[in-house]
Design a protein with these regions (language model features):
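Short, intrinsically disordered, mixed-charge
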Residues: 23, 27, 31, 70, ...
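Secondary-structure boundary/capping signal
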Residues: 33-34, 80
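Short edge beta-strands and adjacent turn/loop segments
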Residues: 34-47
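A short, hydrophobic beta-strand/beta-hairpin element that forms part of a small beta-sheet core
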Residues: 46-54
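Non-catalytic, surface beta->alpha helical segment in thiol-disulfide oxidoreductase systems
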Residues: 54-80
Length: 80
């Protein structure tokens, strides 16, 4: 089972984006995920980590929920 963290910038108003990613991951992988944790941050951060590996960082990647789900998939081992 996998723990996923979605770290988002609170002052930047990225909560909705973090919730969208969390919802998409839970809908796609369901019980194959141990937990999806929303982690508050600042300084424009928006990153997704699966099993302690960064799979998305907005400083390096363009925001795309489907791409984030695909990046998480190898860590979950679920069939989608």
């Amino acid at each position: 089972m996998t723990r996923i963290e979605v770290e988002y910038c609170v002052p930047c108003g990225m909560l909705n984006r973090a919730q969208d990613v969390s919802r998409a991951l839970l809908e796609q992988f369901g019980e194959a995920i141990d937990e999806v944790a929303l982690v508050t941050g600042d300084d424009g951060v928006f990153a997704v980590r699966a099993a302690d590996e960064t799979v998305f960082d907005k400083t390096e990647d363009e925001y795309d929920v489907d791409a984030i789900v695909r990046a998480v998939k190898p860590y979950v081992g679920a069939t989608a």
